[in-house]
Curated annotation (Swiss-Prot):
GO terms for cellular component: cytosol
Keywords: Cytoplasm, Hydrolase, Nuclease, Ribosome biogenesis
Family: Belongs to the YqgF nuclease family.
Pfam family membership, one: RuvX
Name this protein carries in UniProt: Putative pre-16S rRNA nuclease
Functional summary from the UniProt entry: Could be a nuclease involved in processing of the 5'-end of pre-16S rRNA.
An example Gene Ontology biological process: rRNA 5'-end processing
Disulfide cysteine pairs (residue numbers): none
GO molecular function: nuclease activity
PANTHER family the record matches: POLYNUCLEOTIDYL TRANSFERASE, RIBONUCLEASE H-LIKE SUPERFAMILY PROTEIN
Superkingdom of the source species: Bacteria
Amino acid sequence: MTQSIIAFDIGSKTIGLAYSSGVIASSLDTIRFEEYNFDQGLKQLELYLKKYNPSIIVVGYPKNMNNTIGERAEMVDYVIEMFLDMYKSFNKDQIIKVDERRTTKIAKNILIQANLTREKQKKYKDSLAAQLILELYLESRKL
């Protein structure tokens, strides 16, 4: 049975998006908004939620390198709470946090290796990071 999954890579000005039907992760898009205006960013998710009707939302969780919870992870927790308040059809059990350490750096390196311009790197970095986060989740289910 296929399962619709969307992944978020949440930043202060962007939300990178990726999708999977349970097997292969694909980058979707990057939502852009004014810095820390998460309400503006979350409202833009509605189109993707209607189109893909996910049963699971995988969220990149930016722990510190020493495995502690820092400012960025607290920001992600805050955005998750806003998401659940805005989209009542979802509950906290459908939100899965995945350790995202180094995914943005890996995404940047992949885009550099692909010889993309800085402009294109900036355009695709967040959705590629979301794809990597989703791939980590899919791999963890195989274990």
